[in-house]
Amino acid sequence: MKTTHFLIVGVVASMMAYGVKGEDGTLRDDTLTVVASQFTAGDHMSVCDPAGNRITFVVKERSKVPQTQQHVRQDNALAKVGPSLDEPYYQVRMALPIPSAYTPTEQGALVGLDEGVYHHMHSAALEALPNGDMLAIYFSTPVGLAEKDTATTFVQCRRRAGNDYWDMPELLFDTKGGNDQSALLFRDGQRIWFFGGGRGMTDMVPFRVCYSDDNGVSWTYNVPRLDKPASDYTAQPVSNAFRDPEGNLYIVMDAAGSQSFLWRSSDNGLSWHDMGGRTDARHSSIVPLDDKGTLLSIGGKNNDCEGWNPQNISHDWGATWEKATPGVIPPLGTAQRPNMIRLQSGNLLLVTDSYQHKKKIAPPAGWKMGNECVCGVSKDNGKTWTFKALPGTLPQHHRVAHPSVGYVTVRQSDNGMIHILTTTNYPGLEIEFNEAWFWSAEGDLTADTFAPYNLGEGWTVDTASHTAVWTQYWSNGQKHMESTWNIWPTPRDGHRPLCGRIAEGPARHYDEQGHLVREYMFHDGVLQDSIEGETGIKDEGL
């Protein structure tokens, strides 16, 4: 029995129960179509479970190439250009526009955003590319649908080297009839790996494996070869990947319940093996402490050890883990995870929330950082830590008592700058700073001035009013859509203007003959009313 699954956006499609026989007892032979631009099918696109049920992934080319994948530098001349590493530097930017970030209804398409870009953008991946750009990948879910729904997509954003503005979010890929959830990016020399999760497809595909050798312009797509069906897992890659001295590649994934574990590939991303051990928290952040297999796992959520976030040590690359001990940060809950990386200096860096927002649980006694979002640095492989509050953070969009970095991801670029990507805020942020700022007495942003506005193709900027108009065209050259944006806005829950985009004013839609079809009015990123182009009649109830 062979079926091909497609999805109409806005309609919940039933997830196929892969790995079981059809109703008539025959083996399944199913196809999932992956809609993307400049993706090439790799050598491994089909899997069979032990019973013989097959699922095949097919790449289908989009009718357009996202701007994120166009005009990308392929030299590394700008990769090490940046602020001085000797002087404290700390800046905050909006990483996402409003819309689509957490508007009450799906309003992104009304201002010109790409298909598949929805209001919920979460569990993000971040990486500093060889050319100096920053690349972020989120999974995106429409209003009112669950994260495990088949309507989810993977969405990409790029901030180009030397620019203070992120490109507008665009579709990376959409698995029609399958779930796209939880992203991980890993820079491996000149190659960028992307590992994308997705629930409910088959135990033979707990994640997808993509790689790019041209800074994210094009990608090769594969599904993993597992040595046995995945078990005791949740199909969600977390935020860390690394290689060992023998070249084995490891990625972190959620286990079932409040645990995490490592997958290992010994053939450069083709075949994968569950290392077997489990940490004591979901969304754990794991880094090597040496080249002999000693790993440190910190966090991430839904568990505690004596009132603190659990911490585990492995001495065999994650095959086993020592019993959890109380960690150095407070326990976390829903919509929270920490992230830890090793810096170029050799120090460890850790970023986390302090307050458990959904359950309204304050940090444990002994925590000295209040309810702030914090970063911590360890000079001795995690034995001791120094913490500092992160200024300019925002609360979660629906829980506004205290600031949050959400599902945070941290990377360091070749120029030595540290980049933090936050989620669940209104909107998500990028925080950029250096170690000089961390060790200084500075406790705030170091400047409120930015490079000249450079918003990309189709944007006309009025620098005096800090506004811009984004214009898109039909293939015949006629104007298709134009929307107006505040490009130096103060977010709803913030206290200062940031580089970013919030819709402010009209968004006009035209037909292919150039006639105005409809005008939508936005204020602070939210739709206020709509006027029909020909009649001038306003819609009610917006």
Each PLM stretch: what is its role?
Residues K2-V9:
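Sec-dependent signal peptide recognition
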Residues C48, I55-L455, S465-H466:
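Asp-box/BNR beta-propeller blade signature and adjacent active/binding-site loops
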Residues G22-G25, T31, H71-R73, P452-L455, ...:
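Sec-dependent signal peptide cleavage junction
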Residues A41, G162, D448-L542:
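Glycine/tyrosine- and acidic-biased, solvent-exposed loop/turn segments at the edges of beta-strands
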Residues V12-T26:
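Bacterial Sec-dependent signal peptides at the C-terminal "C-region" and cleavage site
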Residues V20, L27, V47, F242, ...:
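Hydrophobic beta-strand positions
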Residues D29-S63:
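Vicinal oxygen chelate
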